Curated annotation (Swiss-Prot):
InterPro entries (UniProt xref): WelO5-like
Organism encoding this protein: Purpureocillium lilacinum
Pfam families noted in UniProt: WelO5
Protein name, as recorded: Leucinostatins biosynthesis cluster protein S
Summary of the function given for this chain in its UniProt record: Part of the gene cluster that mediates the biosynthesis of the lipopeptide antibiotics leucinostatins that show extensive biological activities, including antimalarial, antiviral, antibacterial, antifungal, and antitumor activities, as well as phytotoxic. The function of lcsS within the leucinostatins biosynthesis has not been identified yet.
Induction: Expression is positively regulated by the leucinostatins biosynthesis cluster-specific transcription regulator lcsF.
Lineage, highest ranks first: Eukaryota, Fungi, Dikarya, Ascomycota, Pezizomycotina
Length: 243
């Protein structure tokens, strides 16, 4: 069973941004529980309003640009270049867009405790958005600072949308599901390795385990989603990125 794959570590010099993450103070907390801090904006938080999402993209991108310049490495640009090098010739790799407005992609996220069991899939998270037209999805994550614990666990169980929401969604949490949804499922644990890009299908239910000594350290990652738009999509086939 293969639930994820990973590319080798970046050279140590490429991760000099690690020392700068402690100076990024302008992150806000995602409106989820357990709390997760991040630099950037997510479509998930703004499913009900495209206007609200796109009105905040420029601000999020400005902060991301500052971080990239200080770190001296364009993480999202490198991921796009990697994807472009392996997809069929002529298939564009670009940011997702709506009416000429680009989505934000490349979330810097910090988790001090854990992330609940959940799943992500454009057609369920964004019907009526460009991401709702994708036919396949991946997520990529790059760990920026070494931690103990904090493994991602991916379960061999696809999210079935409303059927699972009605049966397993934990209404006391903002996004989590009951553990019953993955009862008896095979799983794969992804050990976090600094600088390594790990990819998996986020429609598979997944979670992030707690790190050791969360009062002293945090788990910092860069991530976004990758989707495949088919030839029947209004803008034609493409590989798109968004957060």
């Amino acid at each position: 069973m293969t639930l994820y794959f990973a590319y080798p570590n970046a050279e140590s010099g490429d991760c000099k941004c690690l020392g700068l993450i402690f100076f990024v103070k302008d992150y806000y907390g995602e409106k989820v529980f357990p709390p997760i801090g991040c630099v950037g904006i997510t479509q998930f938080e703004n499913q009900a309003s495209k206007t609200n999402y796109f009105s905040n993209v420029d601000k999020a991108r400005s902060l991301q640009k500052r971080f990239m310049e200080e770190a001296g490495v364009d993480v999202v640009g490198r991921v796009k270049a990697l994807l472009q090098s392996i997809v069929p010739p002529g298939l564009p790799v670009r940011l997702a867009q709506e009416d000429g407005k680009s989505y934000f992609a490349g979330l810097l996220r910090l988790i001090n405790s854990s992330a609940l069991i959940h799943a992500d899939y454009g057609p369920f998270d964004g019907p009526g958005w460009e991401i709702g037209a994708i036919k396949a999805q991946l997520t990529w994550n790059i760990l920026l600072k070494e931690v103990r614990g904090g493994e991602s666990v991916v379960y061999n169980r696809f999210w079935k949308g409303k059927e699972d929401d009605d049966k397993y969604r934990d209404v006391t949490k903002s996004y989590g599901y009951s553990r019953d949804v993955i009862d008896g499922c095979e799983s794969k644990k992804i050990a976090p390795i600094v600088g390594q890009i790990a990819l998996f299908n986020p429609r598979n239910f997944h979670e992030v385990l707690a790190i050791e000594n969360p009062e002293k350290v945090s788990r910092y990652t860069f991530s976004s989603f990758i989707g495949y738009l088919p030839p029947t999509a209004p803008e034609g086939p493409a590989i798109i990125l968004w957060s």
